[in-house]
Amino acid sequence: MDVNGRVAVITGGASGIGRGMARAFAGAGMRLVLADLDEAMLAATVDELGEAGTEVIGQRCDVSRLEDVEALAAAAVERFGAVHVLCNNAGVGIPTPTHNIRLEDWKWMIDVDLWGPIYGVKTFLPIMEEQGEGHINTTASVAGLIGGGFMGAYNVAKHGAVGLMTTLERDLRGRKSPVHASVLCPGPINTDISRHSVGYRPSRRSPKANSAAEGRAGANVQAALDNGMDPDEVGRLVLDGVLTDRFWLFTHGWTVKLLTRQLDALAADGSLSKG
């Protein structure tokens, strides 16, 4: 897809991977609609890109609410007349072992990380098909392919997001749709997703570790993020995926190696991993 002058909608666009996407798309000449719940950060990112010459607007949006996603689409079409790229990027996640996750946290993470992309596809796909072109990308995770420990609800939601996008792409190709799909499965990226997520939890407080092992696991997750890939690099990867209509977008080369080990274990003895 030629993206110069086209319109991209990015949820979770105020910071992290979403802001990296926005910067990459702006550099390619796209017009942008950024959505986020953090209105102060959203305004700062819109100002940054606008001052650099990008046509950009911001909209507060809770992707777990269908009416918010529909309002986002309406705002994009009203301002720019079309939507060519949708990035379902908004997400939340807090390290907690499966047996300790509160039911309200299960619902919260699945509402944002899975229902958010579902609402995005349901709302934006008809717009793109009517205009005759488009690309829908969803930010899943390596956790959507290989379920590690201490991230139960997040892993479940991200597995669902991968399933959504693989099925969508097959459906689109099966009926020769002009719209393409892709899924981003990042490894550790230098974002504040865990710290930011706490402020949006239903209980508005951090989960407490019930053991020293849980405390270390949570600290290890945050340390991996703090030392992770630059989100701007991820944004450039997604832009390239849109330009080339590539489905699988991996940030780290070891992703395929981990998948291969998992499949080898399955074939060998039905276990989760070998070695």
Regions found by a protein language model. Name each.
Residues 97-98, 102-107:
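Substrate-binding pocket helix/loop in short-chain dehydrogenase/reductase
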Residues 39-40, 60-71, 103:
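The beta1-alpha1 cofactor-binding region of Rossmann-like NAD(H)/NADP(H)-dependent oxidoreductases
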Residues 173-249:
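SDR active-site lid
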Residues 141:
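Residue(s) in the substrate-gating loop at a strand-loop-helix junction
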Residues 121, 157:
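Active-site helix of classical SDR
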Residues 28-45:
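Conserved glycine-rich Rossmann-like NAD(P)H-binding loop of the short-chain dehydrogenase/reductase
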Residues 2-33:
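Canonical Rossmann dinucleotide-binding motif of NAD(H)/NADP(H)-dependent dehydrogenases/reductases
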